[in-house]
C-alpha cells in the first residue's frame, strides 16, 4: 500500500526521482513516448503528462504503458482526452501501475478510472491505495462452499438462483431492463443483507449513471449526511470517455471490491454494467495498437482479457465477491464472441426477453432460457427443485402449444392442454413483480418476496387450487396472498360495473 501517485500532485522531487521521457507521436488516445536508454518503464506502468496547452490551460493526462516498441520507445494508452498534447512534452514514469483509493472511505462516493472522486464532495479521506493490476487469488485460498444468495425476486430465486460468491450474467438487448434489474438487486441486497456493493459503470450512458446515483440517494443506499453509512461505492467510465478508461474502469471497481473482501473480510457485491463495453473498449484499444483483429472484428486477446478480469472475481476463505454483470447482446445474437466468451465464466445466467417485455411482464426474465448451476436437489432441496422443474415443464408445454393456438384457437385443445395453458398464463404473470426502483413509473409499491413464500405460491398454482381465479390477479403482485386479495378486488369491481 502506498500514496497514490496518479491522484496526488507529483512534487518536483518525485519528478526528478522518476524517469522522464518525451512524447514522440500522438495518434488519438495512443501516445508513443521516448525514454533515455536503460530507463524504459514496465508494461502497465502509469505515465503522467503534465504541462500547458496553447491557451495556457493546465494539462494532466495519465496513460498506461501497453507495448515496448524498441529504440527506447513505449506505446501507451491515455485514460483521459488527449486534446492539447503535443510532441516533445515531458512524460513522467510513475514506476508503478495505476493505484486507486480503497477501504470504507470509498463508500458513497463516485470515482473515475484513476480513482479520482468526481462527485464534487472533496478529496477521499484515505491514504490507502491499491494497484489495479494484480494476480488472482492462489488456488489454495479459494473457498468452494455452495450456498444460495436470496435476491427477493421470484423468477430469479425459483428458476435460476444465484450462488453466494458466484458470477451471474444478465443477458439482454437494448431496452429490456438490465439496468433496472441491477438497481433492484443493489436495493434489495443492501436492505435485506446489509452487504457492501461496488458498482462499475463501464461504457454506459452518463444519464443512467446520474439517475442511478440519485436513486441510491433517495432509497438510502447512499447516505448523504453520513457517507460512512452508505452501502455502495461507484466507479464510472462512461460512453464518452476514451477506450483506455472504459477498458480499465472494471479493474478499478474490482480492486475496491477486493479490498473489502481481503482486508475487511466482508461479503461484497460487484456490479458491472456493462461487461460487453469492457470487451468493446478492449477491441478499440487492440485496433489502435495495431493488432490483427479476430472473429467479428474482436481483439485476438479477447479470452485472455476476459479471463484476467473474471478470475479475480472469486470467493476466498476471507470473504466473497458475488458479481452480477450486465451483458449487452449485439443484435440479440447469443453466439456473438463477446457474450459467448462471457458465458464460460458464469454460474448463472439471467436472460431478459424482448417478447416478455412487449407483453408488459417485468422483470422480463426468460424462465426457460435462464439457467443456474445451483438448481440441483442436493443444493436447493427437493421441494424447490421439483417446483422449479414443474414450472418449467408447464411453461415449455405452453410454448409448444402456442402455434396450435394461433392457427386453430384454444377450443381445439384437449381439456388437459387447456388447463396447462391456463396455469402457464397464471405462472407467467406471477413471475412478474413490482420493483422498488420502478415505483415512480408503475405507481405500485415494490415487493421483496422470500424464497419460501415464492415456492409456496408456485406450488399452489401448480396444484390447481387457484384455477378459478382470473389470470390478471397474478400480474405484478408480491406473494400469492396478494394475488388472492387482488382477485377478490377484481371480482368486486366487475360486480359494481354491472
Curated annotation (Swiss-Prot):
Residues the record lists as Phosphoserine modifications: 13
UniProt subcellular location: Plastid, Chloroplast thylakoid membrane
PTM annotation (Phosphothreonine): residues: 6
Coiled-coil stretches: none
A Pfam family recorded for this sequence: ATP-synt_ab
PROSITE patterns per UniProt: ATPASE_ALPHA_BETA
Name this protein carries in UniProt: ATP synthase subunit beta, chloroplastic
Organism: Raphanus sativus
